[in-house]
Amino acid sequence: AKTVYYMSMEFLMGRALGNNLINMTAYKDVKEALEEMNIDLNVIEDQEPDAALGNGGLGRLAACFLDSLATLNYPAYGCVEVPDNWLKEGNPFEIRREEYAKEVRFGGNIRFEKDPVTGKDKFIQENYESVMAVPYDMPIVGYGNHVVNTLRVWDAKPITDFKLDEFDRGNYHKAVEQENLAKLIVDVLYPNDNHYSGKELRLKQQYFFISASLQALIEKYKKKHGDIRKLHEKVVIQMNDTHPTVAVPELMRLLIDVEGLSWEDAWEVTSKTCAYTNHTIMAEALEKWPIDLFSKLLPRIYQIVQEIDRRFLIKVREMYPGNEEKVRKMAILMNGQVRMANMAIVAGFSVNGVAQLHTEILEKQELKDFYQMMPEKFNNKTNGITQRRFLAHGNPLLADWIT
């Protein structure tokens, strides 16, 4: 079976205790046992902080998907970044996994050289900043089936501790720069991105949890299965909206620069592994990044995006000769911007809307050019909720009456 990696900037999980007890079919037994000791289970539940990694429907959908995947016995990981004030009092359902920590790099420059042995092109990132991504794993309990999946939440830590030698030389800023970078990434979950520094922080946050998640999934896959060229046979990366779509060029980078695959082999794997869920029909809400920011912060990723765009536009011009208007609409790089939704559609094997009408509007209006060129990718997956949390747990009297 394939393992689903559900990449989302938001997971609006809610409290876990009551939900876990219901899914273990133990809620009534535990409630009655506590009542015999004059303890109210609801009071205990109220002590648990609300696990709110998000603020809207996007995050709640992601949480419901994790519940459903575990209940239907699909192996799955949710992947997200953690804000710094996340559950200050601790979380009994959370396990720190220091052994799976990954380095994530930002900025610097890319040096190109030929490997003297293999003759392959090598791209080396230099003069970069980096942080360690440390995962915390939370169990996602399936309903009545003894299945437990995982929500992996990434925290940022400095690679090295405070640099006392730099401080002693009077260079205070250099002494604390790594600590500041790590703190900044997790301090604010939704930075205001109507100015440059807010955009930069948001892009750092997105790349941070995506790079860490992909490094971890490749490591896990190789230990179990070996041949990285067959990754798509065992793994699906589901991108929940445009925020995680930097997963496309990051997977390409890992396959080419780290695993040594050719561009063609890496693209074959990536385009069979990545899938994209679209949540909006508003063109202005489809994420775009200024090229000057994107290329400065993620220089190697930008090179890969350029090549994806170049190769794709060759195909567009072959299929629609002389139609530069179509090229302009479908390009990933246009008017000084990186258009993330376009990249997700080009690279994914599946593009889904979240309601029948929504999907039809995507196909006939907003993404019409892509649908005409690659209709086989488009499909609908109507959203739903987990009735256990919102009915059985939220309104047990109504649930009893219905059943």
Question: What feature does the model see in each segment?
Answer:
Residues 1-403:
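A conserved ligand/cofactor-binding region detector
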